[in-house]
Amino acid sequence: LSFFEIVIYYATVALNHFPTIQRGEKNMLEILELEQEDEKPPSFAQSKDSWLVAVLANIKDERIELPPDVPEDALADFDHIETIRAIQAAIETDGHRTVFIQADSNLPYALKQIKPDICFNIAEGLGGDGREAQVPGLLEMLRIPYTGSRVVTNAISLDKTLTKRIWRDRRLPVAPFQEFLTGDEPLRPEMRFPLFVKPAREGTGMGVDTGAIVNNEAEARERAKWVIRTYRQPALVEQYLPGREFTVAVMGRPDSKLYSRHPEWYDVDGFHRFPIMELDSSCSITPGIYGKAAKSKDIGEEGAPDFYCPARVDDELAKKLQYYAWRGHNLLGALDISRVDIRLDAKGQPCLIEINTLPGLTPDFSDLCVIAKAEGITYKELILEILYLGASRWGMLEARELTPALKKGAGSRVMYRR
């Protein structure tokens, strides 16, 4: 079996520990065949004040033992059932009904049976280099509204190399990088040691530990070949950035204030500027590396990084970080919410690392939730804001009239001129 086939098998076993709907016995052709009555897109009454919201996710079960040829972090992107319950509880406080549906191979049939008004999507997908686009693609085929970024953006954002190429070509700062398919490719002359090697199409710090930093060509090739062999995908090799690390959340779009429950949160461009979070991993279980081991630690736990939110930065650096995150979000066509990771180079200049269009939503643990809490935004408010931003894109909400004060927005637009 291939790596992805093994992951899919064990993920499905894990998911079966959490049944939420009756499995259907129809084959896939019957599942995907749309009845004539379903040919029309869903119609939503503007006055409708209660929806059936399906929360879509992949659930991890740490009781499942993976085979020895599969990396121990293979299911790191998946969510715990407690996170799903927290999202459901937040949505239900506003009068909606919720149901959790596992994002496995039975998802098409489940959606046809349950007929949700909208899906709150945090599903990572099962296998493949575009797995985060699998569920959005299915939802668009079935014409079911959903939250978050759409198909193309979710496919691109998981591919770190492609994301960096887009950012670089649009003059956003990224460290020099190169993708290795075999590990034997000639090293480009602009690649100066130390370098940093990681899987090109993974998230949650998978494949990232202290061994990711390499100091010579032999180490670089050995690490790249290990990544390619272990994760069955290309290795991304990039200039190591020794400076401070930040994560910047981006929420909204140009017309956010017309539909948001909190229009006062948004600037004149329709985006909310969360406080910047700094991640200090110098004291973590993997010093200087914010990888899987460090990310799995609770805040304050021994071996966890130190977090500072708001970050301890001057106004000039704050403007750069906010602008680059906002620009990176928009260039990829991200919607509703994202989180952009940025690190400083040896000269103290910011370089974009990657974007997460499906940021974690575990209360009091995930970076986005900690950032929101630091600003005084409750978990319930965050979840409902994401839900309503998504719903408004599908015609499920009426636009409001903006007062002069709301038109002005929460501060000036995000701008930085180099």
Predicted regions and their residues:
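ATP-dependent carboxylate activation and anion-phosphoryl transfer catalytic cores
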Residues: 9-14, 20-25, 29-41, 166-168, ...
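Active-site nucleotide/adenylate-binding loops and adjacent lid/helix of ATP-dependent enzymes
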Residues: 21-23, 29-35, 40-42, 46-57, ...
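Short phosphate-binding/catalytic loops that engage adenosine nucleotides
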Residues: 96, 144, 172, 232, ...
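Phosphate-binding site of ATP-dependent enzymes
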Residues: 217-323, 344-351
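ATP-binding N-terminal substructure of ATP-dependent carboxylate-amine bond-forming enzymes
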Residues: 3-146, 152, 157-158, 162, ...
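Short acidic/His/Gly/Ser-rich catalytic and metal-binding motifs that mark active-site loops
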Residues: 62-67, 203-206, 299-301, 362-363
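Alpha-helix N-cap recognition
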Residues: 103, 215-217, 378
